[in-house]
Amino acid sequence: MEYKTSKGVTFAYSPLIDVPHGFSTRLGGVSEAAHTSALNLAFDKGDGRETVLKNLALFAAAVGVDEKSIISAPQIHSSTVRRVSAADAGRGYFKECGFACDGYITTERGVTLGVKTADCVPILMCAKRGSESRAVCALHAGWRGTSARIVEAALGELFALGFAPSDIYAAIGPSIGSCCY
């Protein structure tokens, strides 16, 4: 994992994953509430809608994606992994989501998968076979989802799409450590 600051926003990323991505930090946004620091990307943490959407635009620009392509469903601490498409772009931020899950998978370019974590573990997987066949998977892995085998569920989806274990790269983002318990 490496850290980068782009357009005033600091984020972590993995050089192993060759799609635009980032694991946000709290650095670089416009939030003013003390408990959110500056880059709050959640509607339920005390910032107004416009502040969260401005932070989203800043983060998206920093990592090189269109903020309207981001999907972010309510998370339920499960092992549910949902396949999503361009029709789902913007769900959770710009239109009602209509579903809840803790993981997404897509084979379509221009779809950005967003999970929110605090103590839980963000996991990003990219599967690639040849120059055209690609899938991306993002997971919110808390202890409940991990116990329910969310990573195994995601790998099962990737295998069902025809990818082999050697086609898949994964990055584990920043999360809470045992020192905090």
For each feature predicted by the language model, list its residue ranges:
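Active-site microenvironment for binding and transforming phosphate-containing groups
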Residues: M1-Y181
